[in-house]
Amino acid sequence: YFNWKFIWIKAGTASMITQPIVYNGKNAYRSSLVTRSSETVDKYFMMRDTIMAYFSTQLTPLYYRKGAREGKRYYVDEVWYSYSGDKCTTSLKHLTSSGDTYKEKFTYDRCVSDMLNSFQRVRNFDPTGWKEGHTEYLDIAGGEKLVRAKLVYRGKKEVKADNKKKYNCLVLSYIEKEEKKDKEIVRFYVTDDNKHVPVRLDMFLRFGSAKAFLK
């Protein structure tokens, strides 16, 4: 679903899949989020986003890739993670629309993550005792620099999915800084149980907003 001048229309597809894999000889997981606008919406703004994240069975980030076509803009972000003692090193690669490639390497003495891996970590949080406004701070790798992000708990809400079922959900906002102001990127609705299954995603995009529902 896509919000265009306050009218919701069926605008494309979005899917999220997490599956077990073997990465560098070890058991791991691969999570992917794919969004694709419909032919109708393509006339106004084409969107083709594919995000992949690899992480260990303990949810330690291993690799991240985002390939995106948003309108006339196309770019690819990649991050490779390596660890030594208490240090985390990220090797970043950014491909621009013009074909220029930028590479950076940084070492941190704290945990860093990426957006998709952070969402998986959220599913393992224990929200017992959380009040509205509770905030978890995250250091997010991606693009050309490290981004300071946060997850804000918005409370609980009953959500109806595309399968017509209703779910009691926890509501969480993923927020980054843009031009020194908070910018909500995604709002997650996950089931209020031990599994925290994603039921709905509200994505706030450059050209409007979109919603994806559990089928």
Label each residue range with its predicted role:
Residues 77-123:
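Hydrophobic, well-structured mid-protein blocks that either form specific transmembrane helices
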